[in-house]
Amino acid sequence: MFLHGGWLHLIFNMWLLWIFGDNIEDRMGGVRFLAFYLFCGLIAGLTHLYANPLSTIPTIGASGGIAGIMGAYFFLFPYARIVIWVLFLPIFVEVPAIAFLGIWVIIQLYKVTTGMGTVSDGNDVAWFGHLGGFLAGMFLYRPFLLEDRARGGERYRF
């Protein structure tokens, strides 16, 4: 989860972590956030392994753990607006987080349902791992949340 396949792989993952990670870390605290990230990454890896049991190709990258962070963001901040970069253009646009995450999930689903998500077709992206991490983040974030924050004792009930 700490090794990447090149600079673009690293930059894209860190960009997504920068967009979604700070708010999730604020709700969890640093130690719980790290545990959550690692846990989602583990679930993502197991999902990829389940979908590609005969693969001998190692998986690298932070995508599964970051997908988990995105899954938690989907429920915790659905109406937030995020600023994203329009690829290959020096343009940044503000979009609803739920729209960005919805499109991201649709792309992942398209890849796995069309057979493009397996390593047997020469694909070097762990699409099943992305979905596994996202689903883990969506459904397993609650135990990692801090119950009480110093900001006025606000309680989080989701």
How should these model regions be labeled?
Residues 1-158:
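A detector for small-residue-rich transmembrane helices and their helix-helix packing motifs
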